[in-house]
């Protein structure tokens, strides 16, 4: 959803940037990514965070910008980087996405949108669209339906996880032996992470 909105509205801003933060990050590396996305020339060998932050702040001064910080896990992130973003233009926007409500609990965010997980039948349609896009009927065979629902249950209604697993299975032979093998691999990966993550799914592929 955020990706769709971002690509739709970014032309209305002077500059736009999208950076995926993820669970483990370092401020210096994150600032370099932000600078690169905005097209700011910085010395990549320079790890002096104050200098990087000032360069970004000065560049954004007076500009109408949109900045998306995707997949934020740490509550400390916004306090660490809030001063990077110029507030001289009230039409600029900073958007953060997170799977943790506590990350976005600060009153500094004017709007919060909570996305509900997909309903079961919507998950099924999305899964089949990915898993069987190469077939003529684009439907799940009866002998794989029980396993298909097990995969869908693992995704907990998350669209990106459902779509990724569907696409992964589309590259595998469509038989229960192959699918069960993939399921076991995913099960061991998900056991290390309470919430399904696209990066974990890609590891299995």
Where are these regions (language model features)?
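Loop/helix-junction capping segments adjacent to catalytic residues or to phosphate/diphosphate-binding pockets
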Residues: 24-28, 75, 121, 159
């Amino acid at each position: 959803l955020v990706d769709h909105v971002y690509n739709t509205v970014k032309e209305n801003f002077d500059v736009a940037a999208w950076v995926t933060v993820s669970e483990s990050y370092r401020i210096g590396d994150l600032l370099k990514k932000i600078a690169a996305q905005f097209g700011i020339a910085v010395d990549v060998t320079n790890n002096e965070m104050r200098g990087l932050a000032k360069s970004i702040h000065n560049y954004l001064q007076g500009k109408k910008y949109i900045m998306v910080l995707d997949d934020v896990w740490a509550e400390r992130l916004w306090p660490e980087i809030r001063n990077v973003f110029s507030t001289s233009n009230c039409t600029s926007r900073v958007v953060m996405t997170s799977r943790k409500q506590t990350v976005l609990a600060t009153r500094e965010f004017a709007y919060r949108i909570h996305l509900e997980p997909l309903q079961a039948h919507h998950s099924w349609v999305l899964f089949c669209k990915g898993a069987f896009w190469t077939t003529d009927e684009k439907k799940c065979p009866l002998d794989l339906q029980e396993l298909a629902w097990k995969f869908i249950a693992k995704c907990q209604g998350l669209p990106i996880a459902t779509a990724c697993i569907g696409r992964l299975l589309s590259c595998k032979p469509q038989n229960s032996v192959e699918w069960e093998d993939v399921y076991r691999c995913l099960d061991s990966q998900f056991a290390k992470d309470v919430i399904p993550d696209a990066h974990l799914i890609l590891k299995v592929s």
